[in-house]
Each structure stands twice: as C-alpha cells, then as structure tokens.
Regions:
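Charge-dense, helix-prone N-terminal extensions
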Residues: 1-136
C-alpha cells in the first residue's frame, strides 16, 4: 500500500522534478521541463459515465496517473498487474496508466515512477543518475 507521501518521497530523489498543485483537478503533479511523469487523477463525470456503460466502476482510493513508454508498455503493465493498474476510455492512445495507490507495493511504485522519470528527464541527467545509483 502506497500513499501520495510515498510518491513525494520517491520523486524527490529524481533531479529536476518539481511538484505542482492545481490544474483542472486541483491535485498534485510531478514534472520535469519535458512534462508530467505522474499526477493525481480523480474521476470526471464523463469517466464515471463511460465506465458505467462498460459495466465497470472507478475504484476507491487515491488514483495516480503514471506515464509509460508507449502503448506496448501500457498493455504489458495492464496485463501483468490488473489489480493495481487500469485505464479508461479517455486514456485510449495515451501513454499512461492509472494506479491504485491503496494496493500498489511501494517498490513497484518506485519502479514505475523511475521509468516515467527516465522518459521525461534530459538524457545526460538520466545517465548520470543511473550511473550514480549503479543502474548503468
């Protein structure tokens, strides 16, 4: 089980990430200059209506959007962890998954956020960070 505080703690380790609060949903988002890597994502009325039409419901708890490396990666994450990650029609064709923080393991959250950050970080910054952490 993870929390927004875990997201803050994990992303604080990544260079050039800032947290912003606000936007159209009023929640927090974590970004680099290249864009968001993660964001709080409450349901919109249209999400609830579309899910209801599909016979599905929005899960309880805090939901976090996390960027992934394209549609193939998205499909793999959704298939591998169906109780943790989900998607909605609004995200069709968009490289991100929705994450149930109340069920995700903190280590898996760290891996997903690291991968998302690597997609958004400058290549030289990412390479230096990977080397510093023994991952390169």
């Amino acid at each position: 089980m993870a929390s927004i505080e875990d997201v803050r703690r994990i992303t604080a380790d990544f260079p050039r990430v800032t947290e912003r609060t606000g936007g159209h949903n009023g929640g927090s988002s974590w970004r680099t200059n290249a864009g968001m890597l993660a964001w709080e994502r409450p349901p919109r009325r249209s999400d609830l209506e579309q899910l209801a039409a599909l016979g599905r419901e929005w899960p309880d708890g805090v939901i976090l959007g996390i960027r992934v490396d394209g549609e193939v990666a998205k499909a793999a994450v959704l298939e591998t962890y169906p109780d943790v990650f989900f998607t909605i029609p609004h995200f069709d064709g968009f490289p991100a998954v929705l994450t149930r923080l109340d069920v995700i393991d903190v280590q898996l959250l760290r891996e997903m956020l690291t991968d998302a950050w690597l997609l958004r970080a400058p290549k030289t910054v990412a390479a230096a960070w990977l080397k510093e952490h023994g991952l390169a």
